[in-house]
Amino acid sequence: MTLPIRSLDHTAIAVRSIEDALSLYRDLLGGDPQELFERPEQGFRTLTLRFPGGGGIELIAPLGDEGFVQEFLATRGEGVHHMTFMVADLAQSVTEARAAGVRVVGEDYTNPAWQETFISPRSAHGTIIQLAQSNRDLAERAKLWPPDAYRIAQIDDA
């Protein structure tokens, strides 16, 4: 049984400063910055960069001294945080993953633009795997998030 994977959407990299990381991921590697999303209630912000051929890197950085990104940086340092695979049917993927003995955590079907769950690193050789379902591109998804959940800004020349 194989999960209904549509694509490897992005790899998320935990960094202390998105601005400092841009010299590598934008200036040297040629990533095209998309929107910068801030999640104050969870203590982080994120910037996705798209690359030729469709690949993406999501830079995630803490907004302060608390939250999962800060905890990750304190214990592991900067580096790969998770990989996100887009799936055709999230509920089916969860059922199939569990049937295969994989530990699935954090199911969230509340946002119509982005539904997600995670495969525990205990089941994925130390890597967090995010499974997500969305039929919208990044810009369309951003319009559907409630304004109190995300503050959106463009990064032009950060």
Tell me the role of every PLM-derived stretch.
Residues 1-4, 15-23, 28, 48-50, 57, 63, 75-158, ...:
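Vicinal oxygen chelate
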Residues 23-46, 99:
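An N-terminus-focused feature that recognizes amino-terminal "leader" regions
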Residues 72:
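Regulatory and interaction patches adjacent to catalytic/ligand-binding sites
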Residues 3-5, 75-76:
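Short, flexible turn/loop "capping" segments at secondary-structure junctions
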